[in-house]
């Protein structure tokens, strides 16, 4: 029997931090850009190429994969999972980044506990309910719930 290759988690040197960022360890952060006044909770993974906007809060056990951009003043609750692999060929991409898709979350959006976010665009001010599975773009500010996520209630446009 062979010995496993052991890899440590932590904060790699290629992470770019803004001012006054708070990180609760343990975390796994690498190759990402984190804006000013951001809070990252414990047991969070943020992968390469991710951008997190100013004043955003990412709570424990969230997984933010490559290809995700999160705007300013967002709330990402506990256990939120972002997914970039749509199994376009009937199975996992197995690291083939050409098959991965991106996700964009607009300013002021909130994502509830345990939500799953597939490669989509979520508009500014949208609220995704706990446990929702977002499979399509959200283009109108509102509360979205269920699997697949559907509009429950319209919200005022941000800034109005």
What does each of the following model-derived ranges do?
Residues 1-13, 23-122, 147-156:
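Flexible, glycine/small-residue-enriched loop-and-beta-strand segment within the central core
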Residues 16:
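Detector for the N-terminal beta1/A-loop initiation region of ABC nucleotide-binding domains
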Residues 123-134, 143:
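C-terminal/domain-terminus segments
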Residues 160:
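Phosphate-binding loop/pocket of nucleotide- and phosphate-handling active sites
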């Amino acid at each position: 029997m062979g010995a496993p290759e052991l890899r440590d988690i932590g904060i790699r040197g290629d992470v770019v931090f803004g001012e006054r960022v708070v990180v609760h360890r343990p975390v796994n952060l690498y190759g990402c850009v984190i804006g000013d006044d951001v809070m990252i909770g414990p047991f969070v993974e943020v992968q390469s190429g991710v951008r997190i906007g100013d004043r955003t809060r990412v709570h424990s056990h969230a997984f933010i994969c490559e290809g995700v951009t999160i705007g300013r003043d967002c709330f990402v609750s506990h256990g939120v999972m972002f997914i970039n692999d749509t199994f376009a060929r009937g199975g996992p991409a197995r690291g083939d980044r050409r098959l991965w898709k991106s996700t964009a979350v607009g300013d002021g959006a909130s994502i509830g506990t345990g939500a799953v976010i597939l490669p989509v665009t979520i508009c500014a001010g949208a609220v995704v309910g706990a446990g929702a599975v977002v499979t399509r773009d959200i283009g109108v500010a509102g509360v979205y719930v269920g699997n697949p996520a559907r509009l429950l209630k319209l919200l005022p446009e941000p800034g109005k």
